[in-house]
Each structure stands twice: as structure tokens, then as C-alpha cells.
């Protein structure tokens, strides 16, 4: 393709006056051209500074919701009580809980205890000393979505609980450390899988991270396993979640009769942490930052 050819981004302009004029490049391709290809082929929706600010505000509300949940977690409460507190807090802040009625999900929050990997439906289950409990929140604030979750200790954790939570939190950090323009989603998955398996744990493969911001789930999918170079190229303006689910035993799972709750097949512990991430010009920014 010559510089006087029509730009392949579809603008109708000559390449030299369109994508070739952009200063930033990855692999000899202008970033704007690479973005246009991802938009055209995979419907990835890049975010403007205004969008990012809106998602960041929703992200702050997500973190405040998790803090609210943490403040009541103790032995003796039910998972339904966590749902009620977060639902009311979200509504009080003029936001909507995205999970409620999403594809038929009946609650505002996912609350997953011990062997529950994800999508635990809040109800009458009572938290007990030594449990671990994941709380997953997704507020919609002024039309923007943000997604975050944490796994909390209930009372005093045992050795296995401490181990799986520490390893899972570090898996998220390892995945985030791979985020920069020019890397791929496969770099993220590789880092998570490598760390988990090197510590004798396994990565759940049936559930993935995802684009977010304008909708609850957008392209691309972010696998928590894989190889460097696999998947989609990371480019500035992408916003997606990383949410590794790590099992202390085997990675296999089953879905309960409610058609939502995923549990470890061997009944052993599973933990998860999640943040909403923006790819920046030089790396990344968490829009739901926590340690």
C-alpha cells in the first residue's frame, strides 16, 4: 500500500493524510489504523476522556459499595444482608445495580462463599468464622458501568483460605502488570496462569474478563490463561475488566440447579478479585483501584 492509496481504515482519505499522519505507531502501524481495525472487525468500543471520567466515577461508587459490604461482613450474617446493604447504598447514590434482572439474575450483587467460584445468588446462607466471601458489584452511574469485586475473610482465616486469597490477589496484580499498548490480552492471561500454577493452584477457564463502560459486557473477552501474543492487541482507550477466578484445587466446575451458581467440582476453595482497567498511552490506569 502506497502513501497515496486510500486509507484502509475506511475514512475515504489518502493514507498519507489519514492514519499515516498519526505520530504513534505499534509495529510500524499507526495506532489510529489499528484501532479502526479492531472497531471494524470486533466491535471494540474505545472510550473518550469524557467516557473515562464517567466510568471512573462509577468505579469510585463500586469501591464505596465494596467498603460498605466489608463493614458488615462477620460471622452470623446472611448473604442476603450483603445484597440488601449494597442495593440500598447504590440506589441512595442515584445509581442502578447492573446485575439485577440481567439475563434473569434475581439479585443486585453476586455473593460467592468458599467453594462458590462466581455468580452466587444471595439468600439464607449464613457466613461462618473462617469462611471466605467474594462480593461482586457493578453500578451504573449516569449511564456508565464499572465492575469490581473482592474476596473477604469472615472472622479468622485458616491456612487454605489465607493462601488462596493471597495468591488470587497477586494473580490480579500480575495480570495488570502486563497492560500496555503493544502487548496483547494473551500477555495478561499468561501472567495470571503462570503465577497461579507456579503456586499449585488452577485458573478457571469458563469465565472471563470483558470490555465494559457503555454496557455490562462488551468486546473484547479477557482470558485469564494463555500465551503472550494471543488474543487482541492492547491499545489506548480500551476499558475492560480483569477478574481471575483461582481454585486451590482443580480448575473444573459445575453449575447448580439455579443455573447461575458456579462451584468447584472438588468442593475446595475458590477466590476472585476484579478491577476495571483503562489502557493508557504508556501503560494502564485502574478505574476501580485497590491494593
Predicted features and spans:
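Active-site neighborhoods and metal-handling regions in enzymes and metal-associated proteins
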Residues: 11-13, 22-291
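Short Cys/His-rich zinc-binding micro-motifs
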Residues: 1-16, 20
Amino acid at each position: 500500500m502506497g502513501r497515496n492509496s486510500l486509507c484502509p481504515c475506511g475514512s475515504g482519505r489518502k493514507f498519507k493524510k489519514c492514519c499515516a499522519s498519526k505520530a504513534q505507531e505499534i509495529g510500524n502501524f499507526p495506532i489510529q489504523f489499528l484501532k479502526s481495525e479492531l472497531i471494524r472487525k470486533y466491535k471494540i468500543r474505545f472510550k473518550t476522556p469524557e467516557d473515562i471520567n464517567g466510568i471512573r466515577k462509577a468505579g469510585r461508587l463500586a469501591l464505596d459499595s465494596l467498603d460498605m459490604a466489608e463493614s458488615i461482613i462477620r460471622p452470623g450474617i446472611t448473604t442476603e444482608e450483603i445484597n440488601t446493604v449494597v442495593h440500598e447504598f447504590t440506589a441512595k447514590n442515584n445509581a442502578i445495580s447492573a446485575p439485577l434482572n440481567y439475563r434473569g439474575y434475581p439479585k443486585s450483587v453476586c455473593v460467592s462463599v468458599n467453594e462458590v467460584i462466581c455468580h452466587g445468588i444471595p439468600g439464607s446462607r449464613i457466613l461462618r468464622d473462617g469462611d471466605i466471601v467474594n462480593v461482586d458489584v457493578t453500578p451504573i452511574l449516569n449511564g456508565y458501568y464499572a465492575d469490581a469485586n473482592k474476596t473477604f475473610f469472615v472472622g479468622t482465616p485458616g491456612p487454605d483460605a489465607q493462601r488462596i486469597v493471597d495468591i488470587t490477589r497477586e494473580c490480579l496484580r500480575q495480570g495488570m502488570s502486563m497492560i500496555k499498548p503493544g502487548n496483547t490480552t494473551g500477555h495478561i492471561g499468561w501472567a495470571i496462569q503462570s503465577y497461579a500454577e507456579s503456586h499449585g493452584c488452577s485458573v478457571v477457564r469458563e469465565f472471563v474478563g470483558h470490555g465494559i463502560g457503555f454496557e455490562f459486557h462488551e468486546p473484547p473477552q479477557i482470558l485469564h490463561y494463555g500465551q503472550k501474543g494471543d488474543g487482541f492487541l492492547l491499545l489506548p482507550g480500551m476499558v475492560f475488566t480483569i477478574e481471575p477466578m483461582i481454585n486451590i484445587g482443580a480448575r473444573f466446575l459445575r453449575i447448580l440447579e439455579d443455573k447461575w451458581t458456579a462451584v468447584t467440582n472438588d468442593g475446595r476453595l475458590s477466590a476472585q478479585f476484579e478491577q476495571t482497567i483503562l489502557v493508557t498511552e504508556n501503560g494502564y490506569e485502574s478505574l476501580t483501584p485497590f491494593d
